[in-house]
Amino acid sequence: MVADVGYLAIMVAGLGAYWWQHLRTRPRISTVRELFTSDAEVALHVAVHEATTRRQPLSSLHLLYGLLQDEAVVAAIVTAGGNPDSVEDRVLTALAAPTDESDQADEAGRLTRRAAALGHHAGHQASCTDLWAALTGSPAARLLDDCKVDRGATLFALCHGGRAPEITLPDERDVFIVLRNDNYTTQEFVCSLLRDVFALPDAQASAVMLATHTTGRAVVGRFTATAARDKIQRARALARAQAFPLWIGVEPA
């Protein structure tokens, strides 16, 4: 689980501005390597090259184009039921259309700083997964929505390596509902979900959230199979609406 990354973005803003200022002319400087994994660096290089070739300010659409050249991102989109080739066609069409460049002022800088903040918070270099998560709220995210790409399911595949597990249980069984940690679902969202869907008191909701964050997993509680299916479906729907890669499933009681 991740806290509000706004303050973390401020922490890395100065460093982010430095590498962005130099990225266009020296894309392989050490500062970039300190902030981003090699795969993310390649995606950023592709994005910058595409923007430079078109004589456009770097935007979220260029970043998305760069991400679409990454095999793991493409595989995750497919896993989530999307068509990456169709998305790339839509991106190229959008980049070829006239745009108001004033609307794109520092857009890519904000997104890459957010990705760097996500990586910093998790204690690792920012990856293509962080860049994908950082697209939230951008024109690229809206294009993905228009293409019927499930951004949350794609992020889930990038984080957890596949689709959310099916919940097929005999009705007579009791099960434990379990949460697993990720670096993108916010702590505030998890606490709200535990209160609203599972009716946990504030203190217990915070305790379960913190246990998930610190140990990697936590048990929400014991439920009948029927109740577990209903609550997990509700929880996943809420997470999907905000494109969070929340892992919630069951274990035998």
Report the location of each language-model feature:
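Terminal domain-initiation and capping elements
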Residues: 167-253
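Histone-fold recognition with a strong bias for associated Lys/Arg-rich disordered tails
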Residues: 1-167
